[in-house]
Amino acid sequence: MAGGITDTGELYSPYVGLVYMFNLIVGTGALTMPKAFATAGWLVSLVLLMFLGFMSYMTTTFVVEAMAAANAQLRWKRMEKRKEDDEDEDSSSGVSDSDVLLRDSYERAETRPILSVQRRGSPNIFEITERVEMGQMASMFFNKVGVNLFYFCIIIYLYGDLAIYAAAVPVSLMQVTCAIGNHSCNVGDGTKYNDTDKCWGPIRRIDAYRLYLAAFTLLLGPFTFFNVQKTKYLQIMTSLMRWIAFILMIILALIRISRGQAEGHPSMAQLSGIRNLFGVCVYSFMCQHSLPSLITPISKKRHVNKLVLLDYILILAFYSLLSFTAIYCFRNDTLMDMYTLNFTNCEIINVAFIRYFLGLFPVFTISTNFPIIAVTLRNNWKTLFHREGGTYPWLVDRIVFPAITLVPPVLVVFCTHDLESLVGITGAYAGNGIQYLIPAFLAYCSRKDTQLVFGSGTVNKHLSPFRHTFWIVFVLIWGFSCFVFVTANIVLSESKL
């Protein structure tokens, strides 16, 4: 996510893009949503989920608009540079001044109709053909302070991402293997385990968790010191596993409900659970930082905003189905932070393979993503401190940056493995900035720059449906209000303890 223009890659159809976006948004956050739903109450959860889905869609259209504006400016700068190069060639050649004046007047006559067409909404100048990452857009439209705040926000978000991933794998391994060690398969039967309970012999559950965390760090941590990327086949495999797991959980919960074995009696509203639910929902709708690599390769972008809207409706329906089947199938106090662990109970499913597949599902999928996110965070650190023309010493480049990437999240999850809180805090703070504040500022600043460069009559063909300034102000007020609300909620909760 470091700012820069990268290759667009192979083009694909709008509907393939719709599938890719669905897969991008529906990830780890969905596994923590059922617990957050149960804690906040079904009505509050549904209303908040729908509202936050709408807000996320709005800011997604802001980012698409900013991408189009960035592409237009890059084209305009290249046109200006070519014009300057041509003038330099003319001045260095032996042509007379009168010839140069004649050619200049001819060029101006040729360019005037082009510019007037662009102001009426030419499909060319605002076409999204180059992948301009969010960091590059921030550099184009923000001042130096804004760029630094952007990188600070995205770095904090990626730290939260790494912490969630680093905790999810050891938690899943601890829950499954400690149950085996106790000759039981009742991880999700409602039995409350403490961290000090025995796992195997003298080893406590918290000790097992930290051993798994150490092994996870030693196995995947070294990838932070190298360059890795997710291959096409690995992406297909992890996506396939994810959808098999989600479909299995929904079907198993529906079967249990249809047989009259449902235990859930969710409340309508519990305001104390809103803080975590807010963070989980924001985290679960997060896609804005990856939109450039997702939208740019789409071959036909004429109706891209409608396709994105369709995606959000499908995702909203999926989240609702997953969460409602969960809260009616399981009692509130038995729902686990990682929803997959509720299906490791023999009473839910007596097929051992399915139990272990669901219980260990986060281990496989998250382990493939961890090195990629770590390398992305490392590269953002490098971009933040980079100075034009400068290079980093070998020690700083190969040791210091990877170390400051890996150590902080591992230390955090060494002290806590509360996944719901980790997801909630990451979404409520850094996620809030990336999903609401940055897109709103990008839309506002890109509109100002577009008017400055092309004139007030310019029409961006990818202009957001929420084009009135009111919507930008609304998103900014909402984003800052969320910061205040979540912080006040945390302070008040801590003061009651």
UniProtKB/Swiss-Prot annotation:
GO cellular component annotations of the record: membrane
Bilayer topology term: Multi-pass membrane protein
Transmembrane segments: 11-31, 36-56, 149-169, 206-226, 235-255, 278-298, 307-327, 357-377, 399-419, 422-442, 472-492
Extracellular compartment segments: 32-35, 170-205, 256-277, 328-356, 420-421, 493-497
Side Cytoplasmic, residues: 1-10, 57-148, 227-234, 299-306, 378-398, 443-471
Origin superkingdom: Eukaryota
Species assigned in the record: Gallus gallus
Protein name as annotated: Transmembrane protein 104
Assigned keywords, A-Z: Glycoprotein, Membrane, Transmembrane, Transmembrane helix
Similarity remark: Belongs to the TMEM104 family.
Compartments, as annotated in UniProt: Membrane
Glycosylation sites: 194
